[in-house]
Amino acid sequence: MASIQFIQGVDEDIIPTVRLTRSRDGQTGTAVFRFVQPKLLQQQGEITGMYMIDEEGEIVTREVQAKFVNGQPQIIEALYVMKNAQAWERFMRFMNRYAEAKGLSFQRS
């Protein structure tokens, strides 16, 4: 089953919005994840990155930032950069598994 973790061993239950961009030649792309009031804000532990885990293994990004409202963390944003077509395809396989596990669908904008 596919999951996302910020603290290793603790699955994040909040479903993020995900914004994808891809270069015209299809070689590179980015995914921006936005979690509003994620569970990790109530957890104890060090956030060392965002871990996308499925049966193929683990995709990791260290580009994780918190957004604060009135001095309290409310939103976590993570950026994953795909530097080649293979990374894009691997990411899309993960996202398909994650969507299936969470009962979601892909929607083009």
Curated annotation (Swiss-Prot):
Membrane topology summary: Peripheral membrane protein
Compartments in which it is found: Plastid, Chloroplast thylakoid membrane
A Pfam family assignment: Psb28
Coiled-coil spans in chain: none
One GO CC term on file: photosystem II
Main location: plastid
Highest taxon listed in the record's lineage: Eukaryota
Record keywords: Chloroplast, Membrane, Photosynthesis, Photosystem II, Plastid, Thylakoid
GO biological process: photosynthesis
InterPro entries (UniProt xref): Psb28_c1_sf, PSII_Psb28_class-1
Alphabetized HAMAP family for the sequence: PSII_Psb28
NCBIfam families: PS_II_psb28
Family to which this protein belongs: Belongs to the Psb28 family.
Oligomeric form and interacting partners: Part of the photosystem II complex.
The protein's name: Photosystem II reaction center Psb28 protein
Upper classification of the organism: Eukaryota, Rhodophyta, Bangiophyceae, Cyanidiales, Cyanidiaceae
